[in-house]
């Protein structure tokens, strides 16, 4: 989130309730005296909760060391590294206790059908994680199918425990995968022409042309960068149950992308369960067919001033 203040943590600092209200305060000038008027709409719409504010000037990094999109690629790389480190710690703990846990479960009755179904499930999950570059490769070969004739009780017990451990080792990647999957789908499905986004455990994310050439992040159009920055911040940085404020998402954005914007935001909200999303926009294309959920600040504030 492109804010004025940044903590040492990669997660950017959110604005508080009072700062947001002050940012959108309404000014009325009479003679040479300036007065600030609070908006009843903003007071009612923005609860005293944690706020995430995505400003209009969002492409440039505050520290001017890297562009915002380059910082985001590094941020995703750090998330992947953290998940890998957590997975490694889980692996070490489970591997060291495997013999003892195996003896404890030796008398459990496990069917070959159950084993086979779980093997297929974990195989699919690994393939998805590898597809997005979250994990590199399968480090252990697991047979895909077993039959009642070839799978004895002792093998069932070992495999069942192994599968349970394998799933737990992959668990640190679960939430990250859901976010990456949505991020990639939103970009590849709706806005990227002649290129696609790639996820990497070496680069975070990068873009590749249809002919396989890597595209520098700085060579993306301003519209593409604006959209990517918004999606990334909402998916990977904004916190659950927070109130989201987005200022002028239409900046540099193609009209077709503007019409898709609210649908994309709805998908992100479903994943991250935001409390509320408020968007300040001048674009009827952003609103699209959703005028029933809009509030005209100019019109309503003029009415309030006339009534004073």
What kind of region is each of these model predictions?
Residues 75, 89, 101, 158-161, ...:
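Exposed alpha-helical structural elements
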Residues 90, 121-124, 154, 165, ...:
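Alpha-helical protein-protein interaction elements
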Residues 15, 23-24, 155, 162, ...:
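Sequence-level detector for tyrosine residue identity
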Residues 1-147, 192-203, 300-308:
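P-loop NTPase switch/coupling surface
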Residues 1, 174-308:
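Switch/communication elements of ASCE P-loop NTPase nucleotide-binding domains
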């Amino acid at each position: 989130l492109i804010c004025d203040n940044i903590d040492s943590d990669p997660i950017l600092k959110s604005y508080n309730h009072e700062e947001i209200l002050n940012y959108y305060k309404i000014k009325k000038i009479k003679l040479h005296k300036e007065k600030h008027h609070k908006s009843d709409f903003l007071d009612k719409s923005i609860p005293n909760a944690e706020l995430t504010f995505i400003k209009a000037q969002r492409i440039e990094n505050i520290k001017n060391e890297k562009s915002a999109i380059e910082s985001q690629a590094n941020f995703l790389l750090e998330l992947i590294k953290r998940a890998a480190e957590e997975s490694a710690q889980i692996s070490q703990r489970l591997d060291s206790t495997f013999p003892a846990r195996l003896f404890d479960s030796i008398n459990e009755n496990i069917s070959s059908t159950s084993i086979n179904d779980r093997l297929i499930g974990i195989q699919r999950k690994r393939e998805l994680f590898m597809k997005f570059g979250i994990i590199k490769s399968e480090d252990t070969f697991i047979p895909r199918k077993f039959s009642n004739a070839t799978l004895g009780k002792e093998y069932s017990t070992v495999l069942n425990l192994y599968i349970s451990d394998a799933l737990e080792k992959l668990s640190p990647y679960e939430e990250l995968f859901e976010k990456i999957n949505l991020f990639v789908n939103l970009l590849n499905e709706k806005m990227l022409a002649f290129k696609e986004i790639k996820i990497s455990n070496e680069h975070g994310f990068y873009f590749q042309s249809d002919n396989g050439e890597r595209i520098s992040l700085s060579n993306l159009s301003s519209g593409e960068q604006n959209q990517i920055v918004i999606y990334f911040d909402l998916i990977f940085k904004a916190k659950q149950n927070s109130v989201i404020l987005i200022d002028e998402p239409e900046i540099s954005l193609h009209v077709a992308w503007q019409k898709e914007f609210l649908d994309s935001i709805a998908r992100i909200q479903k994943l991250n369960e935001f409390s509320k999303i408020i968007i300040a926009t001048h674009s009827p294309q952003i609103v699209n067919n959703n005028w029933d959920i809009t509030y005209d600040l100019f019109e309503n504030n003029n009415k309030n001033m006339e009534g004073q």
